[in-house]
Amino acid sequence: MPKLKTKSAVKKRFKLTASGKVVASQAGKKHFMRRRTKAQIRNLRGTTILCDQDGYNIKKYFLPYGTN
């Protein structure tokens, strides 16, 4: 049986931590920034850890060799 391929789009958007959690960048920072306060924009910086179920789905369906 051949190796499973990792989805390229998911590979670019998510990272796995050493403990197996899935990390993604914050959503909602591409446009419509004028209507947001400076504090809201500042809070969108950096990354966030996905909830358990979302992380499980990413690892199971899109990252076949991620820790399950």
Swiss-Prot record:
Molecular functions per Gene Ontology: structural constituent of ribosome
Alphabetized UniProt keyword annotations: Ribonucleoprotein, Ribosomal protein
Annotated TM spans: none
Record Pfam families: Ribosomal_L35p (PF01632)
One Gene Ontology term, aspect cellular component: cytosolic large ribosomal subunit
SUPFAM superfamilies per UniProt: L35p-like (SSF143034)
Keyword Ribosomal protein carried by entry: yes
Biological process according to GO: translation
Entry-linked InterPro entries: Ribosomal_bL35, Ribosomal_bL35-like, Ribosomal_bL35_CS, Ribosomal_bL35_sf
Family: Belongs to the bacterial ribosomal protein bL35 family.
Protein's name in the database: Large ribosomal subunit protein bL35
Origin organism lineage: Bacteria, Pseudomonadati, Pseudomonadota, Alphaproteobacteria, Rickettsiales
Gene field: rpmI
